[in-house]
Amino acid sequence: MSVMNGDIKERVKNAKRIVVKVGTSTLTYANGNLNLGLLNKLVWVLSDLRNQERDVVLVTSGAIGVGSKKLDFKTRPKETREKQAAAAVGQAELMHIYQNFFSEYSQKTAQILLTKDDFKEGERKTNTNNTFETLLEYGVIPIVNA
């Protein structure tokens, strides 16, 4: 987690809705193992924001990296079928870990899997927006795969 400058810190302090993006390099050590200590700190901070009745959305990547480690791939997969297999295994693992950590702080979470088509004008975009708004209305922290 990085240090924020004063302007950003002030905007976050007053924000009703906060979206946090964490990437693979934040989630894992150089050897590919998950940084569970950092993940727990992140979840603690987001849970505390939620306890302040702020809307929180977590955007996370890392599914391919986590899945590759779990499948004992020696290098990052290059073929689509291997990437998809690693992503499927890794996404399930990440959600399991996030749900366990968030439940320690009595937070509700939901997994949101999106494609670029979900943001195009029309019914899909409306449904996507409605899903987010409904989850946030019920105090759920959406976890979005990036």
Task: Give short role names for the model-derived ranges.
Residues 1-146:
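Nucleotide/pyrophosphate-binding catalytic subdomain
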